[in-house]
UniProtKB/Swiss-Prot annotation:
Pathway: Pyrimidine metabolism; UMP biosynthesis via de novo pathway; UMP from orotate: step 2/2. GO terms for molecular function: orotidine-5'-phosphate decarboxylase activity. Belongs to the OMP decarboxylase family. Type 2 subfamily. It comes from Janthinobacterium sp. (strain Marseille) (Minibacterium massiliensis). InterPro entries: Aldolase_TIM, OMPdecase_AS, OMPdecase_type-2, OMPdeCOase_dom, RibuloseP-bd_barrel. This is Orotidine 5'-phosphate decarboxylase.
Length: 271
């Protein structure tokens, strides 16, 4: 099953478009986990088990693991997801962007080492920097387009031939890079007007939408701007608001409650 097929199936089977980010920050961990050698693995597994039925994808952010020399725990988390929840896509949030030969190694890292179903990439260096990922048609390639951070406007909103650069990226991916039907775009919930414009440009292409929760994006505006005609097409990501809902031994139950509330809020505006 391809990434897009798996994503479409879980949208329908679990009735959710909530993507849960796995961004382990030891400073925010419950006290009973701090100092343990496998704290990250334990924390993430408990979050996953508590929220799996609310999620259309899990999105580990690689920098949070690499900074702590915890790539082995990330491998274990991805293995756990594949074994226990094979129906839920793994999106490796790496935002890679490099020349072709290096990109080939990054693609191997994402899809072979970690076994991710999809990976985020940076389009700034052009097609040859993305091609190694596209050569695996069963895997998803999620391209940065209009990101949720304020500084994204520095480049993404530059006027190029009468249109902002992010619209050129959206059209380029939709018209030229998506020949295998495996692409998606990152578009922030913090910019609902731009989100609506991207949706109009790319049709039913999936959108990974960060920026709700701790970043303050509005769920109603996000759903109205980002949904497809059949009410799907979105991976609306929340990380910190779910992961760190509580910092005690009930952290997983608290995370589940926030995930349920977020999923239900998304569904309320789809209905």
């Amino acid at each position: 099953m391809t990434f897009i097929e798996k994503l479409s199936a879980v949208w329908q089977s679990q009735k959710t478009q909530l993507c849960i980010g796995l961004d382990p920050d030891l400073a925010k961990f419950p006290a009973h986990l701090k100092g343990k050698p496998d704290a990250i693995l334990t924390f993430c597994k408990e979050i996953i088990d508590a929220t799996a039925d609310t999620a259309c994808a899990f999105k580990p952010q690689i920098a949070y693991f690499a900074a702590l020399r915890a790539e082995d725990q990330l491998e274990a988390i991805c293995s756990y997801l594949r074994e226990r929840y094979p129906h839920i896509p793994i999106v490796l949030d790496a935002k890679r962007g490099d020349i072709g030969a290096t990109a080939e190694q990054y693609a191997r890292e994402a899809f072979e080492r970690y076994g991710a179903d999809a990976v985020t990439v940076n389009p700034y260096m052009g097609f040859d920097s993305v091609q190694p990922y596209l050569e695996r048609p069963d895997r998803g390639v999620i391209v940065l387009c209009r990101t949720s951070n304020a500084g994204g406007s520095d480049l993404q909103f530059l006027n190029v031939d009468g249109k902002p650069l992010y619209q050129h990226v959206a059209q380029l991916v939709a018209d030229k890079w998506n020949t295998n039907g495996q692409c998606a775009l990152v578009v922030g919930a913090t910019f609902p007007n731009e989100l609506a414009q991207v949706r109009a440009l790319v049709g039913d292409m999936p959108l990974l939408i960060p920026g709700i929760g701790a970043q303050g994006g509005d769920i109603k505006a996000t759903v109205e701007a980002g949904r497809t005609a059949n009410g799907t097409g979105m991976m609306i990501n929340s990380s910190r608001a779910i992961l760190y809902a509580k910092a005690d031994e009930t952290f997983a139950q608290a995370a589940r409650q926030v995930a349920l509330e977020t999923r239900d809020a998304i569904n309320r505006y789809i209905a």
